[in-house]
Amino acid sequence: MAVKRREFCKLAGVSALALAGGSASAPGAAAEANETDKLIGEPIVGNRWAMVVDLQACRKEEGCRDCIVACHSTHNVPAIDEPKEEVKWIWKEHFAEAFPNQQHEYLAHDLQHEEVLVFCNHCDSPPCTRVCPTQATWKRDDGIVMMDWHRCIGCRYCVAACPYGSRSFNWRDPRPYIDEINADFPTRSRGVVEKCTFCDERLAQGRMPACVEACKDKCLVFGDLEDPGSEVRRLLEKRHAVRRKPGLGTQPEVYYLV
């Protein structure tokens, strides 16, 4: 008698489990599943994500790179010394370069030469997403500007469109330039663009961005702008904040407390 398709699938599944030396209800499998559950919490969701950088607090720790190291090690960002081929998700720029429109002759001298953290601004009106021919970069409903490295064809239109220099192009295979690869996050290949994604993969696991967790002085605050009770809203309502190149109309979602 011919075996029906449903019965065949059942038999195939049982055979596969037997060959694997266990069953779905085996103690080892259950323990492994429990360990996985411990690692993944409830996703952190928001309507409009934003980052607040406290420049005063950050300036107290001169030379600190904890957030940069955490971000780059978490996301397998290669350490390439050649400036023209450097890949970076979060880095430091002089205040005068990061905020050219905030300059005036009476600006505090130490602030003019101070280095500030910069990364993708996850603009509310991102020019990068409009020029991508393959939709490899797009803005989610919660405001995060994403990247799909498998769809990226390396045209670099988005790099040219970004007025903040927040996107890096892999001119070479980045893998040899990663000291220790994080197996939990994909590496990229030569010929694709990459950038900060506000740690979307960590938010999905119920974790805050790596840079925020790494900052021991709480200089970085991440939260939902549309939540009146969020810390980012409280800080922005209490203190004066600036955004990079506001005249461009991109509406950055990274705010700097000065």
Per-segment meaning from a language model:
Residues 1-19:
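N-terminal secretory signal peptides and thylakoid transit peptides that target proteins
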